[in-house]
Amino acid sequence: MSETVPPAPAASAAPEKPLAGKKAKKPAKAAAASKKKPAGPSVSELIVQAASSSKERGGVSLAALKKALAAAGYDVEKNNSRIKLGIKSLVSKGTLVQTKGTGASGSFKLNKKASSVETKPGASKVATKTKATGASKKLKKATGASKKSVKTPKKAKKPAATRKSSKNPKKPKTVKPKKVAKSPAKAKAVKPKAAKARVTKPKTAKPKKAAPKKK
C-alpha cells in the first residue's frame, strides 16, 4: 500500500499583522500633531489686547497683564516665562512701549503707530500688488513698442536707391554750362549791326518852299 503525504499548512495570516501595526501608528501621529497646535490666540496677541483695553495713562503693569490673561482663560502660572518673553519681543518690535521699569517688569503701553500698521496689513498688500501690476503692464507696453521700433528701420533701408539718386545729378551739371556759354556770344554779334545801320543813314534837310508874294 502507498503512503499518502499530508499537505503543508499555508501561511496566510502572518503578513497581515505588520500592516495592522502600521495603520495603528498613523492616528497616533495625527493626535500628537493636534495636541501641539494651541487653540485660540497666542500670548503676544493676548498681551496686545490687554494693553489696548486698558485706559490707564501710565500704561499697564505686569500684574495687570497677568490678571487680564487669566481672565481670558490663559494659564498664567505655567506660562509665566512665555509671558515675559512675549512682552520683551513686543517691546523690541515696537508694538509696546515701556513707560516704567526695565525688562519684563514695569508698565507697558500700546504703540498707536505700530497698532495701526498691524491692523491694516491686507490694504498695504493690495496697494503693493496693484502698483506692481501697473508697473509690469507699463513695462510690457514699453517693450512691445521698442520691438516695433526696432523692426521698422529694417524695411526702410534701401541702399540701392540712394546710390542711383547720387549718380543722376552728375549728368545735368556737365550739360548746362555749354548752353550758357553759347547764348552770350550771339547777343554780342547782334548789337554792332544795329549801330552801323544808324550811321549809314544820315538825315538830309529838305528845302522849305517859299511862300508866293501877294500882288
Curated annotation (Swiss-Prot):
Domain of life, source organism: Eukaryota
Phosphothreonine found at: T204
Sites bearing Citrulline, chain numbering: R57
Subcellular compartments: Nucleus; Chromosome
Feature: compositional bias, Basic residues: 20-38, 148-181, 188-215
Sorted UniProt keywords: Acetylation, Chromosome, Citrullination, DNA-binding, Hydroxylation, Nucleus, Phosphoprotein
Record field: transmembrane: none
Any GO CC annotation of this UniProt entry: cell surface
A GO biological process held by the record: nucleosome assembly
Chief location category: nucleus
SMART domains referenced in this protein's UniProt entry, alphabetically: H15
PTM text: H1 histones are progressively phosphorylated during the cell cycle, becoming maximally phosphorylated during late G2 phase and M phase, and being dephosphorylated sharply thereafter. Citrullination at Arg-57 (H1R54ci) by PADI4 takes place within the DNA-binding site of H1 and results in its displacement from chromatin and global chromatin decondensation, thereby promoting pluripotency and stem cell maintenance.
GO molecular function list: chromatin DNA binding; double-stranded DNA binding; heparin binding; nucleosomal DNA binding; structural constituent of chromatin
Record PTM N6-(beta-hydroxybutyryl)lysine, positions in chain: K37, K55, K67, K88, K93, K109
Residue positions, PTM N6-acetyllysine: K17, K78, K93, K125
Annotated domain remarks: The C-terminal domain is required for high-affinity binding to chromatin.
Role played: Histone H1 protein binds to linker DNA between nucleosomes forming the macromolecular structure known as the chromatin fiber. Histones H1 are necessary for the condensation of nucleosome chains into higher-order structured fibers. Also acts as a regulator of individual gene transcription through chromatin remodeling, nucleosome spacing and DNA methylation.
Protein name per the record: Histone H1.1
Organism: Homo sapiens (Human)
